[in-house]
């Protein structure tokens, strides 16, 4: 195989795993770090931290691969996704399946270094990662499944650090689901016209003209759940300041999506990286 061909293929694999678009990994990373710090009431064990950070990137890559495989026959009809490696033919279906298996094996190899409770919970993570891409064909609520998939590192983190699943763990998972549905609805607003044309379901379509209101309510629910978590965990003032900053970011996002235009909606989605970061810094400083 010629060097240029190898380079082209490697670039295609990177695009399939979204290495060139780290936003998804970051949105998966922040809740993971929230959970690890809350479960350990401070900096977690180094080995556990490394396992989860690597696991985030491997599982996010695996999720992107299976998502593109599931959407391979419809992505060519959507402007934003038509040039992806599978619909464009740069990578074959067989190659994508092999890559998915490799990424899952790498992820599971990491989990095997943790306790048995975490290993069992990881099976649910695999199931959620596999079924999510197919949900948009059967329900208008695929974003809820995505929220569970993106948040499943939370119970896994608590299990790995404390071998327990306290109330705070489930409140944090619920907060993450609310947040995920909010930001992924913003993301779905970008593709709403294309999705309506090809019959793909999403919360952006389900919510219709009430989309901005429901996103706002989900963002409010996220903040209120975070307040409850801060109270239960006796977190310091820095955490509550971080909640206020997250609220300001949510308000800014509402302004961006006000006209429901594609580019501002996508920027609002990207802005959620700062929400996750700010909340993590609030937790981090509280345990300093």
UniProtKB/Swiss-Prot annotation:
Pathway noted in the entry: Cofactor biosynthesis; ubiquinone biosynthesis
Keyword 4Fe-4S belongs to the record: no
Compartments, record wording: Cell inner membrane
Cystine connections: none
A single GO cellular-component term on record: plasma membrane
Swiss-Prot/TrEMBL catalytic activity: all-trans-octaprenyl diphosphate + 4-hydroxybenzoate = 4-hydroxy-3-(all-trans-octaprenyl)benzoate + diphosphate
Residue stretches spanning the membrane: 23-43, 46-66, 98-118, 141-161, 163-183, 213-233, 234-254, 268-288
A GO biological-process term: ubiquinone biosynthetic process
Entry's EC annotation: 2.5.1.39
Record key words, sorted: Cell inner membrane, Cell membrane, Magnesium, Membrane, Transferase, Transmembrane, Transmembrane helix, Ubiquinone biosynthesis
Topology of this chain in the membrane: Multi-pass membrane protein
Pfam families found in the cross-reference section: UbiA
Top class in the EC scheme: transferase
Cofactors named for this entry: Mg(2+)
Database matches in NCBIfam families: ubiA_proteo (TIGR01474)
Function: Catalyzes the prenylation of para-hydroxybenzoate (PHB) with an all-trans polyprenyl group. Mediates the second step in the final reaction sequence of ubiquinone-8 (UQ-8) biosynthesis, which is the condensation of the polyisoprenoid side chain with PHB, generating the first membrane-bound Q intermediate 3-octaprenyl-4-hydroxybenzoate.
Family that this chain belongs to: Belongs to the UbiA prenyltransferase family.
Record HAMAP family: UbiA
UniProt protein name: 4-hydroxybenzoate octaprenyltransferase
Gene: ubiA
